[in-house]
Regions:
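Conserved subregion of the PPM/PP2C metallophosphatase catalytic domain
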Residues: 114-119
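SIR2/sirtuin-family catalytic core signature
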Residues: 1-24, 30-34, 45-49, 54, ...
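Short glycine/proline- and acidic residue-enriched helix-loop micro-motifs
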Residues: 72-80
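Active-site-proximal beta-strand elements of phosphoester/diester hydrolases
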Residues: 144-149
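Active-site glycine-rich loop that binds ribose-phosphate moieties when present
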Residues: 160-176
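Active-site glycine-centered loops adjacent to acidic/histidine catalytic or metal-binding residues
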Residues: 27, 109
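Short, glycine/acidic-enriched capping/hinge loops at junctions between secondary-structure elements
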Residues: 34-40
Protein backbone atom coordinates (compact mmCIF):
# COMPACT_ATOMS: atom_id res chain seq x y z
CA UNK A 1 0.00 0.00 0.00
CA UNK A 2 1.49 3.40 -0.98
CA UNK A 3 2.25 6.03 1.62
CA UNK A 4 -0.44 8.74 1.95
CA UNK A 5 1.74 11.38 0.30
CA UNK A 6 2.43 9.09 -2.66
CA UNK A 7 -1.24 8.13 -2.95
CA UNK A 8 -2.32 11.77 -3.01
CA UNK A 9 0.47 12.87 -5.36
CA UNK A 10 -0.38 10.00 -7.71
CA UNK A 11 -4.05 10.97 -7.67
CA UNK A 12 -3.19 14.55 -8.60
CA UNK A 13 -0.82 13.42 -11.35
CA UNK A 14 -3.46 11.17 -12.91
CA UNK A 15 -5.96 14.02 -13.00
CA UNK A 16 -3.40 16.48 -14.35
CA UNK A 17 -2.58 14.09 -17.18
CA UNK A 18 -6.30 13.96 -17.94
CA UNK A 19 -6.56 17.75 -17.97
CA UNK A 20 -8.50 17.96 -14.69
CA UNK A 21 -7.84 20.06 -11.60
CA UNK A 22 -9.68 18.78 -8.52
CA UNK A 23 -11.85 21.00 -6.37
CA UNK A 24 -10.29 21.34 -2.91
CA UNK A 25 -13.10 21.17 -0.34
CA UNK A 26 -11.91 22.62 2.97
CA UNK A 27 -13.90 21.77 6.09
CA UNK A 28 -13.97 22.74 9.73
CA UNK A 29 -10.91 20.66 10.61
CA UNK A 30 -8.69 23.19 8.84
CA UNK A 31 -10.09 26.04 10.93
CA UNK A 32 -9.68 23.91 14.05
CA UNK A 33 -5.95 23.78 13.29
CA UNK A 34 -5.94 27.58 13.70
CA UNK A 35 -7.74 27.41 17.02
CA UNK A 36 -11.33 27.81 15.86
CA UNK A 37 -13.77 25.43 17.54
CA UNK A 38 -15.51 22.90 15.35
CA UNK A 39 -19.24 22.48 15.69
CA UNK A 40 -18.52 19.33 17.70
CA UNK A 41 -16.27 21.37 19.98
CA UNK A 42 -18.96 24.00 20.48
CA UNK A 43 -21.39 21.21 21.38
CA UNK A 44 -19.23 20.27 24.37
CA UNK A 45 -19.57 23.77 25.83
CA UNK A 46 -23.29 23.96 25.10
CA UNK A 47 -24.03 20.61 26.76
CA UNK A 48 -22.43 21.82 29.97
CA UNK A 49 -25.24 24.39 30.20
CA UNK A 50 -27.94 22.28 28.56
CA UNK A 51 -27.26 18.67 29.58
CA UNK A 52 -30.82 17.51 28.99
CA UNK A 53 -30.91 18.21 25.26
CA UNK A 54 -30.83 15.23 22.93
CA UNK A 55 -30.12 17.39 19.90
CA UNK A 56 -26.77 17.65 18.13
CA UNK A 57 -25.06 20.00 15.72
CA UNK A 58 -27.17 22.78 14.27
CA UNK A 59 -30.27 21.58 16.12
CA UNK A 60 -28.45 21.77 19.47
CA UNK A 61 -27.46 25.39 18.86
CA UNK A 62 -31.07 26.25 18.02
CA UNK A 63 -32.27 24.35 21.10
CA UNK A 64 -29.76 26.20 23.29
CA UNK A 65 -30.91 29.61 22.03
CA UNK A 66 -34.57 28.65 22.49
CA UNK A 67 -33.96 27.58 26.10
CA UNK A 68 -31.30 30.02 27.33
CA UNK A 69 -31.21 32.86 24.82
CA UNK A 70 -28.66 34.37 22.46
CA UNK A 71 -26.91 36.32 25.23
CA UNK A 72 -26.07 33.05 27.00
CA UNK A 73 -24.80 31.60 23.73
CA UNK A 74 -22.59 34.68 23.32
CA UNK A 75 -21.28 34.19 26.87
CA UNK A 76 -20.40 30.55 26.19
CA UNK A 77 -18.61 31.41 22.95
CA UNK A 78 -16.78 34.22 24.73
CA UNK A 79 -15.07 31.66 26.94
CA UNK A 80 -13.44 29.90 24.01
CA UNK A 81 -9.78 30.75 23.35
CA UNK A 82 -9.05 33.36 20.70
CA UNK A 83 -7.88 31.68 17.48
CA UNK A 84 -4.79 32.45 15.45
CA UNK A 85 -5.08 34.19 12.05
CA UNK A 86 -4.23 31.01 10.11
CA UNK A 87 -2.28 27.78 10.45
CA UNK A 88 0.34 25.91 8.40
CA UNK A 89 -2.39 23.93 6.65
CA UNK A 90 -3.82 27.17 5.25
CA UNK A 91 -0.40 28.25 4.03
CA UNK A 92 -0.01 24.87 2.32
CA UNK A 93 -3.42 25.23 0.67
CA UNK A 94 -2.49 28.70 -0.60
CA UNK A 95 0.77 27.39 -2.05
CA UNK A 96 -1.02 24.50 -3.76
CA UNK A 97 -3.59 26.84 -5.25
CA UNK A 98 -0.90 29.27 -6.35
CA UNK A 99 0.95 26.44 -8.07
CA UNK A 100 -2.19 25.62 -10.05
CA UNK A 101 -2.72 22.24 -8.38
CA UNK A 102 -6.19 23.08 -7.02
CA UNK A 103 -7.34 26.43 -8.45
CA UNK A 104 -10.91 26.05 -7.14
CA UNK A 105 -11.70 25.83 -3.42
CA UNK A 106 -15.01 25.16 -1.70
CA UNK A 107 -15.31 25.96 2.01
CA UNK A 108 -18.07 25.73 4.57
CA UNK A 109 -16.09 27.64 7.22
CA UNK A 110 -17.05 30.94 8.83
CA UNK A 111 -13.64 32.58 9.22
CA UNK A 112 -11.11 34.35 7.01
CA UNK A 113 -8.16 32.02 7.58
CA UNK A 114 -8.06 30.96 3.93
CA UNK A 115 -8.12 34.51 2.59
CA UNK A 116 -5.53 35.63 5.15
CA UNK A 117 -3.16 32.84 4.14
CA UNK A 118 -3.59 33.61 0.44
CA UNK A 119 -2.79 37.27 1.06
CA UNK A 120 0.30 36.37 3.10
CA UNK A 121 1.61 33.99 0.44
CA UNK A 122 0.77 36.46 -2.33
CA UNK A 123 -1.71 34.34 -4.28
CA UNK A 124 -4.36 36.32 -6.16
CA UNK A 125 -7.89 35.02 -5.72
CA UNK A 126 -11.53 35.83 -6.25
CA UNK A 127 -14.12 34.97 -3.61
CA UNK A 128 -17.78 34.20 -4.22
CA UNK A 129 -20.51 32.97 -1.93
CA UNK A 130 -23.37 30.60 -2.43
CA UNK A 131 -25.94 33.37 -2.29
CA UNK A 132 -24.54 34.41 -5.67
CA UNK A 133 -25.07 32.30 -8.74
CA UNK A 134 -21.67 31.26 -10.04
CA UNK A 135 -20.03 29.24 -12.75
CA UNK A 136 -16.52 27.89 -12.32
CA UNK A 137 -14.35 29.85 -14.72
CA UNK A 138 -11.07 29.11 -16.37
CA UNK A 139 -8.06 31.39 -16.20
CA UNK A 140 -5.26 31.90 -13.74
CA UNK A 141 -7.05 33.38 -10.74
CA UNK A 142 -7.88 31.04 -7.88
CA UNK A 143 -11.56 30.86 -6.97
CA UNK A 144 -12.74 30.51 -3.37
CA UNK A 145 -16.39 29.48 -3.19
CA UNK A 146 -18.01 30.00 0.20
CA UNK A 147 -21.15 28.38 1.51
CA UNK A 148 -21.52 31.24 4.03
CA UNK A 149 -21.20 34.89 3.03
CA UNK A 150 -19.69 37.74 5.03
CA UNK A 151 -17.13 35.78 7.04
CA UNK A 152 -15.34 37.69 9.76
CA UNK A 153 -15.74 37.51 13.50
CA UNK A 154 -16.39 33.82 14.06
CA UNK A 155 -18.42 34.28 17.23
CA UNK A 156 -20.85 36.61 15.47
CA UNK A 157 -21.01 34.16 12.59
CA UNK A 158 -21.86 31.27 14.90
CA UNK A 159 -24.59 33.27 16.60
CA UNK A 160 -26.04 34.48 13.31
CA UNK A 161 -25.47 31.58 10.94
CA UNK A 162 -25.00 28.33 12.86
CA UNK A 163 -28.67 27.78 13.45
CA UNK A 164 -31.13 25.19 12.26
CA UNK A 165 -32.99 27.79 10.23
CA UNK A 166 -29.88 28.98 8.38
CA UNK A 167 -28.76 25.41 7.81
CA UNK A 168 -32.09 24.48 6.23
CA UNK A 169 -32.12 27.65 4.13
CA UNK A 170 -28.69 26.88 2.69
CA UNK A 171 -29.50 23.23 2.00
CA UNK A 172 -31.20 23.38 -1.42
CA UNK A 173 -28.76 25.98 -2.74
CA UNK A 174 -25.76 23.87 -1.82
CA UNK A 175 -27.32 20.76 -3.33
CA UNK A 176 -27.90 22.68 -6.56
CA UNK A 177 -24.24 23.67 -6.80
CA UNK A 178 -23.04 20.22 -5.81
CA UNK A 179 -25.06 18.77 -8.66
CA UNK A 180 -23.85 21.45 -11.03
CA UNK A 181 -20.14 21.26 -10.29
CA UNK A 182 -19.22 17.98 -8.60
CA UNK A 183 -20.51 15.99 -11.54
CA UNK A 184 -17.76 17.45 -13.69
CA UNK A 185 -14.71 17.56 -11.41
CA UNK A 186 -12.91 15.33 -8.92
CA UNK A 187 -12.76 16.56 -5.32
CA UNK A 188 -10.18 16.42 -2.53
CA UNK A 189 -11.80 16.78 0.89
CA UNK A 190 -9.52 18.19 3.61
CA UNK A 191 -10.58 18.85 7.20
CA UNK A 192 -13.98 17.29 6.54
CA UNK A 193 -15.63 14.69 8.75
CA UNK A 194 -17.58 13.48 5.68
CA UNK A 195 -20.77 13.56 7.75
CA UNK A 196 -22.31 16.68 6.21
CA UNK A 197 -25.87 15.57 5.37
CA UNK A 198 -26.01 17.94 2.41
CA UNK A 199 -23.18 16.06 0.70
CA UNK A 200 -24.40 12.62 1.74
CA UNK A 201 -28.01 13.35 0.77
CA UNK A 202 -26.92 14.66 -2.60
CA UNK A 203 -24.94 11.50 -3.27
CA UNK A 204 -27.82 9.33 -2.07
CA UNK A 205 -30.22 11.15 -4.41
CA UNK A 206 -28.19 10.15 -7.46
CA UNK A 207 -28.97 6.92 -9.29
CA UNK A 208 -26.35 4.25 -8.74
CA UNK A 209 -25.23 4.58 -12.35
CA UNK A 210 -24.70 8.34 -11.92
CA UNK A 211 -22.67 7.85 -8.74
CA UNK A 212 -20.54 5.31 -10.55
CA UNK A 213 -19.84 7.85 -13.30
CA UNK A 214 -18.59 10.57 -10.94
CA UNK A 215 -14.90 11.41 -11.11
CA UNK A 216 -12.81 9.65 -8.49
CA UNK A 217 -12.35 11.78 -5.36
CA UNK A 218 -10.27 11.53 -2.20
CA UNK A 219 -11.04 12.33 1.45
CA UNK A 220 -8.06 13.10 3.68
CA UNK A 221 -9.03 12.35 7.27
CA UNK A 222 -7.98 10.46 10.38
CA UNK A 223 -8.67 6.78 10.87
CA UNK A 224 -10.81 7.67 13.88
CA UNK A 225 -12.96 10.00 11.77
CA UNK A 226 -13.37 7.34 9.08
CA UNK A 227 -14.38 4.66 11.58
CA UNK A 228 -16.83 7.11 13.17
CA UNK A 229 -18.77 7.17 9.91
CA UNK A 230 -21.75 4.84 9.84
CA UNK A 231 -21.08 1.83 7.57
CA UNK A 232 -23.91 2.80 5.18
CA UNK A 233 -22.28 6.21 4.70
CA UNK A 234 -18.89 4.65 4.03
CA UNK A 235 -20.58 2.41 1.46
CA UNK A 236 -22.31 5.43 -0.09
CA UNK A 237 -19.01 7.28 -0.47
CA UNK A 238 -17.39 4.19 -1.97
CA UNK A 239 -20.23 3.89 -4.49
CA UNK A 240 -19.44 7.46 -5.60
CA UNK A 241 -15.73 6.73 -6.10
CA UNK A 242 -14.74 8.63 -2.93
CA UNK A 243 -11.80 6.84 -1.33
CA UNK A 244 -10.20 7.79 2.00
CA UNK A 245 -6.56 8.63 2.55
CA UNK A 246 -6.23 7.79 6.23
CA UNK A 247 -3.80 9.34 8.69
CA UNK A 248 -3.24 8.72 12.42
CA UNK A 249 -4.06 12.25 13.64
CA UNK A 250 -4.82 15.82 12.59
CA UNK A 251 -1.18 16.86 12.83
CA UNK A 252 -0.43 14.27 10.16
CA UNK A 253 -3.13 15.78 7.93
CA UNK A 254 -1.36 19.14 8.19
CA UNK A 255 1.99 17.47 7.56
CA UNK A 256 0.65 15.77 4.44
CA UNK A 257 -0.60 19.04 2.98
CA UNK A 258 2.65 20.85 3.83
CA UNK A 259 4.71 18.12 2.16
CA UNK A 260 2.46 18.13 -0.89
CA UNK A 261 2.85 21.90 -1.20
CA UNK A 262 6.61 21.48 -0.95
CA UNK A 263 6.57 19.04 -3.84
CA UNK A 264 4.43 21.40 -5.90
CA UNK A 265 7.09 24.11 -5.58
Amino acid sequence: MPQPIDALAGFLEQNRDGGLHPILWIGAGASAAAGYPTLAGIEVFLRQKLPGSREAGFALVADFVAELGESELAAVLGGVAEPRPFAPIHTAVARLAGAGVCPVLFTTNYDRTIENAFAEVGVAFGAQCLEDDFVLQGGNQVQIIRLHCDPGDWRSAVRAVVSLRAFEASYPRLVHHLDRNLRTRPVIFVGCSMRDPRLLDWLASLPVSDRRDLHASRAILTREEWLRLAPPNRDLLASANVKPILLPDHESVTGLMVELAGRAG
